UniProtKB/Swiss-Prot annotation:
Chain's gene name: guaC
SMART domains: IMPDH
Catalytic activity: IMP + NH4(+) + NADP(+) = GMP + NADPH + 2 H(+)
Protein name listed in UniProt: GMP reductase
Alphabetized PROSITE patterns for the sequence: IMP_DH_GMP_RED
């Protein structure tokens, strides 16, 4: 098995077949809807809030609302009243079962439900998938997080409509340091490994540092890419703004950090400061343009054409050209 990550791989260009990069279509069909980009902001308190979720949904971007200090039923009802997509997160605790039940009994429902725990290859996840499928059979269920083909196969067999791949590769995640486990440092290999056995869509979650990493994720099997740090630190971001040496920053912390949990127990995340980047809409526009450029370099016109390119691994024992692997 090859071991590599985003910084160790470059994609190889093919003959360009468009007159302008703007002809390339980076949109993606994911579940029952089509979205402008194969990118979703991480469902974290310092990345998005209800206001940002509404804006994303209204502008045809995928989102997953976080589950922390949130009245999920009220949020879902508000989105329904505005004719917007309802996409929420769920844990596996009794309170999470109650949320699913309330969405069902109220008739509000949900379009997407993401079961989101640090180690998703668990019986608790199997039970929650079954509960959602029973109570909200029309919902598109995303489950995770996992890091091995064995785990992905199980989640698919348990009924997940998509799986989230990535254990601890994020910028504010310290799972591998605290536990010795994870996909940090080889996230792209883990994605490739899992994609080989997948029969349903994969969300690559974590480790994205540059816009080009989105194209690499699609190349190695991702249908959607979850991004945290690149979406944190915007003017609209919900984190507190602080000034350091005359420069503005926004706080950004992991969902398993003590800042998010409110206690120092089973901590696998940390807090950092992200420079304020400007407006979210500008970042999304730039991501779209960069992904259009990636598709043109792939000799294609649509997102799936990225999966046809060759790649090289830079340095190490696996260095060399790889053909359509």
């Amino acid at each position: 098995m090859e071991i590599f990550d985003y910084d160790n791989v470059l994609l190889l260009p093919r003959q360009c077949r468009v007159e302008s990069r703007s002809e390339c279509d980076p949109s993606v069909e994911f579940g029952p809807r089509r979205f402008k980009l194969p990118v979703v902001p991480a469902n974290m308190k310092t990345v998005l809030d209800e206001r940002i979720a509404r804006w994303l949904a209204a502008n045809d971007y995928f989102y997953v609302m976080h589950r922390f200090d949130l009245d999920a039923l009220a949020f879902a009802r508000s989105m329904r009243e505005q004719g917007l997509c309802v996409s929420i997160s769920s844990g596996v605790k009794p309170a999470d079962y109650a949320v699913i039940d309330s969405l069902a009994t109220s008739g509000v429902g949900a379009d997407y439900i993401t079961i989101d725990i640090a180690h998703g290859h668990a019986e608790s996840v199997r039970r929650m998938i079954a509960h959602i499928k029973q109570r909200l059979p029309e919902a598109f269920v995303i489950a995770g997080n996992v890091g091995t083909p064995e785990a992905l196969i199980d989640l698919e067999n348990w009924g997940a409509d998509a799986t989230k791949v990535g254990i601890g590769p994020g910028k504010v995640c310290i799972t591998r340091l605290k536990t010795g486990f994870g996909t940090g440092g080889w996230q792209l290999s883990a994605l490739k490994w899992c994609a080989r056995v997948a029969t349903k869509p994969i969300i690559a979650d974590g480790g994205i540092r540059h816009h080009g990493d989105i194209a690499k994720s699609v190349r190695f099997g991702a249908a959607m890419v979850m991004v945290g740090s690149l979406f944190a630190g915007h003017e609209e971001s919900p984190g507190d703004t602080v000034e350091v040496d005359g420069r503005l920053y926004k706080e950004y912390y992991g969902s398993a950090s003590d800042f998010n949990k409110g206690e120092y127990k089973h901590v696998e995340g940390k807090r950092i400061l992200e420079p304020v980047k400007g407006r979210l809409a500008d970042t999304l526009r730039e991501m779209r343009e960069d992904l259009q450029s990636s598709i043109s370099y792939a000799g294609g016109r649509q997102l799936s054409d990225l999966r046809r390119v060759n790649y090289v691994i830079l340095g190490g024992e696996n260095a060399g050209e790889h053909l359509l692997m």
